[in-house]
Amino acid sequence: MADLDDIKDGKDFRTDQPQKNIPFTLKGCGALDWGMQSRLSRIFNPKTGKTVMLAFDHGYFQGPTTGLERIDINIAPLFEHADVLMCTRGILRSVVPPATNRPVVLRASGANSILAELSNEAVALSMDDAVRLNSCAVAAQVYIGSEYEHQSIKNIIQLVDAGMKVGMPTMAVTGVGKDMVRDQRYFSLATRIAAEMGAQIIKTYYVEKGFERIVAGCPVPIVIAGGKKLPEREALEMCWQAIDQGASGVDMGRNIFQSDHPVAMMKAVQAVVHHNETADRAYELYLSEKQ
């Protein structure tokens, strides 16, 4: 029982000072529940509103691709330099130490491989397991215009509905079919559909013409995919252009772990995203850090 001795009435209520109601300023997320906003605040740095995610979930359909042969050797040293880790539950449980203390976005779609039609995915993770693993969001592909468009959209809807019950954000990842044109019109369509279905974060590709229109037409935060490996200077330029045109962060994989100096590249990307450094300045940082 609590000690009831020496209880004193409160006196300093500051009646002349109204309680502060601090708004949640992440784009399109002001009306979400406290738990979901809390998870989003771990993904997006509250001071900058941006994020640098490290994606190493490629094995769910590619297997042990270049740079991901040994997660424990090649990727683990990068954990401390990332804001967020994006991986599958299998890799999380088997390789990522719980003491890593980084927010995790769990890959939640799968059941396909590079040997078959990539757009034929199913939900590959229960929301109970996502909560059990203390993840901050789940992620699934959405393949607009593909053979399995309908199923991929249903996957997003299923995850959003399940996530709303437990305060778990869903990140929709815009996949591109073999014959799809990667242009502003396509990604404006894909990102908007995913947001309309309720996804709280959209991951999509940067395009040189009209990317700012993609961002403007999407009511929730957009993070860009790194895509195929580029020379480091080009990758940093892509990051800078995307952030300058309204992206809320990057989710990079191959342009980090396939770099000759992955830690230096992570630091350079962080400089662009969180410190507004130009691509030139960030590349200078990369060159200095790799020595």
Swiss-Prot record:
Name its cellular compartments: Cytoplasm
Q: What class of enzyme is it?
A: transferase
Q: What is its main location?
A: cytoplasm
Kindly summarize what the UniProt induction comment says about this protein's expression.
Answer: In the absence of AI-2, repressed by LsrR. Induced by AI-2, via release of the LsrR repressor. In the absence of glucose, induced by cAMP-CRP by direct binding to the upstream region of the lsr promoter.
Q: Any idea which residues are catalytic in this one?
A: K203 (schiff-base intermediate with substrate)
So what does this thing catalyse? dihydroxyacetone phosphate + acetyl-CoA = 3-hydroxy-2,4-dioxopentyl phosphate + CoA
Provide the alphabetized UniProt keywords. Answer: Cytoplasm, Schiff base, Transferase
Q: What GO cellular component term, any one, is given? A: cytoplasm
Q: What are its E.C. numbers?
A: 2.3.1.245
Matches recorded under InterPro entries: Aldolase_TIM, DeoC/FbaB/LacD_aldolase, DeoC/FbaB_aldolase, FbaB-like, LsrF
Name one molecular function that GO assigns to this entry: fructose-bisphosphate aldolase activity
Job description of the protein: Involved in the degradation of phospho-AI-2, thereby terminating induction of the lsr operon and closing the AI-2 signaling cycle. Catalyzes the transfer of an acetyl moiety from 3-hydroxy-5-phosphonooxypentane-2,4-dione to CoA to form glycerone phosphate and acetyl-CoA.
Provide the assembly information.
Homodecamer.
Report the family membership. Belongs to the DeoC/FbaB aldolase family.
Give the protein name, as stated in the record: 3-hydroxy-5-phosphonooxypentane-2,4-dione thiolase
Q: Supply the source organism for this entry.
A: Escherichia coli (strain K12)
